[in-house]
């Protein structure tokens, strides 16, 4: 990757429904010149509609890696819990390399703040997981 390029992270909310590549071809949703072979017509994917109304087709593996269902409050709670768990795990991995190592890299006060952040992340994660359990039972 070009070193002048910076990393960007974004999130989009889309509407989607399952659709095969063959159906996408019939609805002219594939890029110009793309015609699925006979074995590709049944390839699983999704019709994706963006906020501006633009529609496209995405292969199932690509779509499912980028998007999670967020139709209900429980869906959104699962997403938040999964994202928080991943951030917490990453921070813990850094801190588990040792306080002294972190302090040498970023300073003692910042390391102490990261330890505090980790503690708050764990507490918040406990609350989210309790909400998930309670919501599932109702």
PLM-predicted stretches and their roles:
Residues 130-138:
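Long amphipathic alpha-helical coiled-coil segments
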Residues 97-112:
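Acidic interhelical loop/turn segments
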Residues 1-95, 113, 119, 126-130:
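Motif-centric detector for short Cys/His coordination patterns
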């Amino acid at each position: 990757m070009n070193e002048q390029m910076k990393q960007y992270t974004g999130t989009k909310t889309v509407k989607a429904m399952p659709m095969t590549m063959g159906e996408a071809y019939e609805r002219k949703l594939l890029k110009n010149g793309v015609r699925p072979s006979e074995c590709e017509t049944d390839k699983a994917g999704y019709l994706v509609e963006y906020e501006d109304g633009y529609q496209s087709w995405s292969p199932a593996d690509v779509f499912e890696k980028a998007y999670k269902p967020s139709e209900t409050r429980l869906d959104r709670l699962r997403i938040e819990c999964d994202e928080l768990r991943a951030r917490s795990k990453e921070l813990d991995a850094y801190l588990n390399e040792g306080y002294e190592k972190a302090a040498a890299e970023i300073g003692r006060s910042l390391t102490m703040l990261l330890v505090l952040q980790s503690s708050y992340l764990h507490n918040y994660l406990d609350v989210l997981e309790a909400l998930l359990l309670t919501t599932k039972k109702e």
